[in-house]
Amino acid sequence: MTAASRANPYSIVSSEEDGLHLVTMSGANGFGNGKVHTRRRCRNRFVKKNGQCNIEFANMDEKSQRYLADMFTTCVDIRWRYMLLIFSLAFLASWLLFGIIFWVIAVAHGDLEPAEGRGRTPCVMQVHGFMAAFLFSIETQTTIGYGLRCVTEECPVAVFMVVAQSIVGCIIDSFMIGAIMAKMARPKKRAQTLLFSHNAVVALRDGKLCLMWRVGNLRKSHIVEAHVRAQLIKPRVTEEGEYIPLDQIDIDVGFDKGLDRIFLVSPITILHEIDEASPLFGISRQDLETDDFEIVVILEGMVEATAMTTQARSSYLANEILWGHRFEPVLFEEKNQYKIDYSHFHKTYEVPSTPRCSAKDLVENKFLLPSANSFCYENELAFLSRDEEDEADGDQDGRSRDGLSPQARHDFDRLQAGGGVLEQRPYRRESEI
């Protein structure tokens, strides 16, 4: 039996689009049989895949005044081109304002008259027109100091304006530098290197149906105190007939047990056990295909370099949740280290033995679950890994015609018959909660 033929019972999903079609139909005892059908059209997202909220504000009273009242946050939030335009205009306006003031002082003092008709010291040396006053304003605020133009003791008001312009220039510089640094160091940019799987999956874990999705960190720098949470968002009508378009329900990811706090060094599968307290308790595979809800997942933590809190968000619509699938392993042990293969991060494989019924029916009707010793994809991968190691060691004695040793063939037959679980091999399962 070849490796390719052994992998045939499992359908590998390589993309989100393919995953929407690999859905099993009902079979005996509530289990699927691998048939294919299509899903309904997607609803509008509340949170996009990139974490942006799909909302638009309208009819806000005094919006401009409120945004201007919090000018610093406004400058940090707006786009770079608008922020640079605002500061450029601020500098230009201050130069023009003080240039006009120095020009008015020169006119009032008679400094613009011909030199032979003045007979007194000017307020600002070498200022004979508005352009010269404007250049003096720029030199004062930027401390260029060419040396041709300077204020004298003749006019105290000119001295006062030089001091005032220096203070205004420092304020603008400080505000601009602070806004630029805050914008560059914003922790939300760290969220660009935090990854969520394209799909969530529902599968059995320790005899219970669980909702699972995968998170990963693309940088070697850690997310300190990382923790996850999730909410189910769906429309609801109350007992009084009130319609709530986006009702938010918490989804437990192990808060009471501390399982929501994760060590995000390698990709981790987040797990929500579908029990009596879960909003998904009564949802079966058929309900999932027609239901209208969205699961918003959030990963929070502190950036190691700056200790600032960052948040990464994503969401899964009902048609992005693959029932009866599991994630492919991405973490492998290789020589003296662990290797993470991100090409498998979004991939899933189908588990035909997953019950099609809801977790509620599974508990109440006591459907028979597959044996804990049944052959699974991870065991098959470990089996192939051991086979490859045997070949690398040059142990070719006793090989059968299809490339397997008698002991390997015995293990394989025993696993297919449900006789036991393959012992742990160098290729191991991914880190999971």
Curated annotation (Swiss-Prot):
Cite the record's Basic and acidic residues compositional bias ranges: 396-414
- The residue numbers the entry assigns to motif Selectivity filter are 143-148
Q: How does it associate, per the subunit comment?
A: Homotetramer. Forms heteromer with KCNJ4. Can form heteromeric channels with Kir2.6/KCNJ18. Association, via its PDZ-recognition domain, with LIN7A, LIN7B, LIN7C, DLG1, CASK and APBA1 plays a key role in its localization and trafficking.
* Molecular function via GO: inward rectifier potassium channel activity; metal ion binding
The way it spans or sits in the membrane comes to:
Multi-pass membrane protein
Which ranges make up the Cytoplasmic topological domains here?
1-77, 184-433
Topological domains on the Extracellular side lie at 105-129, 147-155
Localization (cell): Membrane; Cell membrane; Cell membrane, Sarcolemma, T-tubule
Which InterPro entries does the protein's record reference?
Answer: Ig_E-set, IRK_C, K_chnl_inward-rec_Kir, K_chnl_inward-rec_Kir2.2, K_chnl_inward-rec_Kir_cyto, K_chnl_inward-rec_Kir_N, Kir_TM
Q: Where is this motif: PDZ-binding?
A: 431-433
Recorded source organism is Homo sapiens (Human)
Name the residues that bind K(+) 4: 145-146
Q: What is this protein called?
A: ATP-sensitive inward rectifier potassium channel 12
